[in-house]
Amino acid sequence: GSICLEPKVVGPCTAYFRRFYFDSETGKCTPFIYGGCEGNGNNFETLRACRAICRA
């Protein structure tokens, strides 16, 4: 869906969560560190969830 086209958002908080986002340029789900707040929908707890929703 459209959340897969949203940019990666780390957010202003300083927690350390390993998450995955769909990189629309490469067509792959890629790990990133999420700060814990003010993210968007392109933020998945697992690689499997990212691939399932974004069909990567």
Curated annotation (Swiss-Prot):
User: What SUPFAM superfamilies does the entry give?
Assistant: BPTI-like
Instruction: Answer yes or no on keyword Disulfide bond.
Output: yes
Q: Which InterPro entries match?
A: Kunitz_BPTI, Kunitz_BPTI_sf, Prtase_inh_Kunz-CS, TFPI/VKTCI-like
Entry-linked SMART domains: KU (SM00131)
**Subcellular locations according to the entry:** Secreted; Nematocyst
Question: Keywords, A to Z?
Answer: Disulfide bond, Ion channel impairing toxin, Nematocyst, Neurotoxin, Protease inhibitor, Secreted, Serine protease inhibitor, Toxin
Q: What else is known?
A: Negative results: intravenous doses (up to 1 mg/kg) has no toxic effect and generated no behavioral disorders in mice.
Identification of the protein by name: TauPI-stichotoxin-Hcr2c
Protein species of origin: Radianthus crispa (Leathery sea anemone)
